[in-house]
């Protein structure tokens, strides 16, 4: 199998090999990097797109584009001009709040069963997709994100793996002619096994509003002989309930009255009458069965029972896989009684308590309960009900959107969701049941509804797609952007930081890393050459909208797929273009390669290996160099083209494409020019002179100038808005408009524009923007700005945190050139000098352990015994880097010795300085007594007294 597939895609493998070779060559080219694709933020999705048509779409590539081989069951999509690439979040769950809706998965209803071996219950379950099996009425919050992703991958794997088995089963059952679409499950109706025909709820969609899902009891519908018609009748009544419920909720009596008086369409009435006739009481059917005995003509239903083969063929044409079971049921009268359920109540009237119009017939109890139930639902649920008003006139089901029918073989047939038929790439659509007289698109017409009103909340739809020659299946989607569907965007193998799948467009854009030197690129006759750095160059990313609004864009942009650029050299004749003048972006590659410009003789010192240069002079008129590299001149001008080649090496040769024209050639007559200028002269040039003029050197190297004679008048330019200034030469061919901005402003765009032969200016009017100095990068965490003005002549004022000081200018000025007057300053920590410990003293403090005495550091001083501190005992480091006080010193002192008994010491002090004397005064009756010579105690420098204190003794002791 693998070998057959490889042989089948052998040309494709060759094309892939060639593409890889081109990629390697392009990477070796230092000028461009076309393979890289940049991922930019996708335009924000905005609800409000019209309901897309469900159809089978085969992406048709351009002639020069490698075929992506992608097929989608999706909508007809449109790509806005300003859309390039996308990197959007993977959306799996359905939001539950109207303000949070960003995605929707909307499923059609259908009863085309694909497995005839299933019984009724299994057949009903086959209508439920893997995503729908877990949906219960009370659980609308979805599974965790990882479970949803795993379920999505497993579901795609099952669809791929089971395709061959299903094909074999159908071949054995004779179902090969039914096409591919019926093999796959239709995700439409959810079967509630505990429900009954009286508790039916509408199914068929998960809307973006709140994701409400409604269930229908399918068992009786599947037992019906005409399940599609039975389902339509049931759904019609449910829709009528929703309409009445909405009418009652809004309280518009007049609107409800009009709803009552509104007559249903003729075909709808005929269907209802047909259903009522089929659903008669069994006794009436028994009485009808006796009609032939009375000689009357049997009814149509009895004729169908008499011809079960016809009914079976009818179901086979419709693709119903349970035709055999229906065969047996059609033969049994008991089957007709089983499907004779009558829906109670008339939904075309209001309850009596509404008080509107005449007295209507009361609703049945169950209908009243249902009506009350729907009345308690949110507005989004009522929108979900209204959404089901499908427009069937054109065979479309506008509510049927983007659910996979899938498949592995990209060339097989597929059944459209519109029941339009079986699609074949060669034969187109083939009707599913062309011989069915009961199938009529006009009979399926229902009430037309403005789908835009029900689709305003849907902004994104996802679907599976087959990518590549091997049918690789990926999750793809379309988004509503600016009122148009954008896409398809298909999932990549990468994930973002949150674990969500990344999406990218099917076609890759071309990335340009840098434009080759001296090469001018134009898009739609508008220059996209980068602005030189001295003119306020800044890096910009390019989209299609940017291309239209900016004339000169720096390198590093993307060109969307399918769009082309025009290329020419800056100075025609001085540089020679190597390559094509037009390059097309084709699925990430340039077709052909990006050209380059090579210098000629005047730039290479007349090297023999260089092509000759061509100098151009125009008299009696102006000229313009077109984006395609053509020189346009007005009629009746004189054109002189000089081939620059040394005369001593030989004589070059001029040739031209207009072979029937004759021009004079020869060396220039001027004395200073005749040594290197071989001239071709065209006097009074006319339209017949248009063509390509080539100069060939004696060594065979050539250089050409394409000339076209044209007359054009460009639109008159109005005076631009201040501060932009315009100096206009005129608006004829080749005349220029020069723009200028005053000092302090930067010109954004081209400095001049030339009137081209097309009648358009080469560049749009530029704009003046106030020069802004670049953003200041504050790397120092202690540095802050207290004033900032980045405009010209503005200033930036800096400040450091407390405890730090500036090293550098405290203020920078923004100069008119757009640069700052100096570098950004820095902050340096403030420190004080370590103080010296005093003599006979000590120094202390917690700041000493930090080894840095910064602002706020505290230092304390103390003295040894016998010494007293002179000065402040503690000092602090201030913001100017100085101590708050001078360091203290220690002075020697004698302590207070205490009063002797019966006496007093004089003078009385706490401490005594060195050299102080003490005297003792005794109390009356006592006299001083000395143990030695009578000397007074003296305080010595070491802090000790010279002798003991005198004692006071009584007269008796003396």
Curated annotation (Swiss-Prot):
Keyword Transmembrane included in the entry's annotation: no
Cellular localization per UniProt: Secreted
The keyword Transferase is annotated on this UniProt entry: no
Domain Ig-like C2-type, residue spans: 612-708
Signal peptide: 1-30
Phenotype when the gene is knocked out: Flies are unable to jump or fly and walk slowly with an unstable gait. Occasionally they exhibit body and wing tremors while standing or walking.
InterPro entries, per database record: Compl-Cell_Adhes-Reg, Ig-like_dom, Ig-like_dom_sf, Ig-like_fold, Sushi/SCR/CCP_sf, Sushi_SCR_CCP_dom
Disulfide partners: 569-597, 643-695, 714-755, 741-768, 773-814, 800-827, 832-877, 863-890, 894-939, 922-952
Glycosylation sites: 376, 525, 605, 620, 752, 789
Residue ranges with Acidic residues bias: 129-138, 437-447
PANTHER family tied to this protein: COMPLEMENT COMPONENT-RELATED SUSHI DOMAIN-CONTAINING, LOCOMOTION-RELATED PROTEIN HIKARU GENKI
Protein name, entry field: Locomotion-related protein Hikaru genki
Protein species of origin: Drosophila melanogaster
